[in-house]
Curated annotation (Swiss-Prot):
UniProt-listed Pfam families: CTP_transf_3
Gene (name only): kdsB
Entry keyword annotation includes Cell membrane: no
PANTHER family, per the entry: 3-DEOXY-MANNO-OCTULOSONATE CYTIDYLYLTRANSFERASE, 3-DEOXY-MANNO-OCTULOSONATE CYTIDYLYLTRANSFERASE, MITOCHONDRIAL
Organism field: Wolinella succinogenes (strain ATCC 29543 / DSM 1740 / CCUG 13145 / JCM 31913 / LMG 7466 / NCTC 11488 / FDC 602W) (Vibrio succinogenes)
Record-listed E.C. numbers: 2.7.7.38
Name of the protein in question: 3-deoxy-manno-octulosonate cytidylyltransferase
């Protein structure tokens, strides 16, 4: 099951999820791609968004306006839908219209496989390799991993710090994608955790899981996806869709 949180009043770019890209609302483009992988439901605090989705043949449900995060929103949706504790649930962000179905499918398969192991992760997510220039953008979250491909830390700052690098050192960073996989039970458990100081400092809710000692398994993917966080990002998206 894929759940897409869709808050209409985004702080940085209000109403971005209903902005049209070549005549199609962004949230519809995201959901249509997700539907190529699994059953998909949009969870929104806005009746307008719900009606837009349903008009385009996408299942959508109305959720509370009081949620602090998209994860809290999809947790409510999972309860409304009565999803079982063992079911793998993917959280796909409603502002990533370029996220390829193959990437979503890869994370789903990895979480399904890992959840059957001896030491299943609490949740899973994905990253792509990015350049030093890309890593300097605080809107692009970076992640560093342990030797078992689990996240050690996420930050808006460029991490790791390459102390002894030279001009010839091939620097690279891991850019986090806004894509998560849980089981039904781990999703509800995550939302029951108290927030952590690091989460509040970085404004990154995934740090809540790490702060409480939970594992986040990471997979590397190749993608051209990026989040639409500003009007400038939307202009970039319009150009890419126009050229494709």
């Amino acid at each position: 099951m894929i759940l897409i949180p869709a808050r209409l009043a985004s702080t940085r770019f209000p109403r971005k999820i209903v902005q049209e890209i070549l005549g199609i609302p962004m949230i519809v483009r995201v959901a249509k791609r997700a539907m190529e992988v699994d059953s998909t439901v949009v969870a929104s605090d806005s009746l307008e968004v719900v009606e837009i989705c349903r008009h385009h043949g996408i299942e959508a449900i109305l959720t509370s306006k009081d949620h602090a995060s998209g994860t809290d929103r999809i947790a409510e949706a999972a309860r409304i839908l009565e999803l079982p504790p063992h079911e793998v649930i993917l959280n796909v962000q409603g502002d990533e219209p370029f996220l390829e179905p193959e990437v979503i499918a890869s994370l789903k398969e990895k979480m399904q496989e890992a959840s059957l192991g001896d030491s299943p992760p609490f949740m899973a997510s994905a990253y792509k390799k990015v350049s030093q220039e890309e890593a300097s953008d605080p809107n692009l979250v970076k992640v560093v991993l342990d030797n078992h491909s689990c996240a050690l830390y996420f930050s808006r700052s460029p991490i790791p710090f390459w102390r002894d690098c030279t001009e010839s050192t091939p620097l690279f960073y891991r850019g986090h994608l806004g894509l998560y996989a849980y089981t039904g039970s781990s999703l509800q458990a995550f939302c029951a955790l108290p927030s952590s100081p690091l989460e509040e400092i970085e404004k990154l809710e995934q740090l809540r899981a790490l702060s409480h000692g939970h594992k986040i398994l990471m997979i590397e993917v190749e993608t051209r996806s990026f989040g639409i966080d500003t009007p400038q990002d939307l202009n970039r998206a319009l150009k890419i869709f126009g050229d494709s």
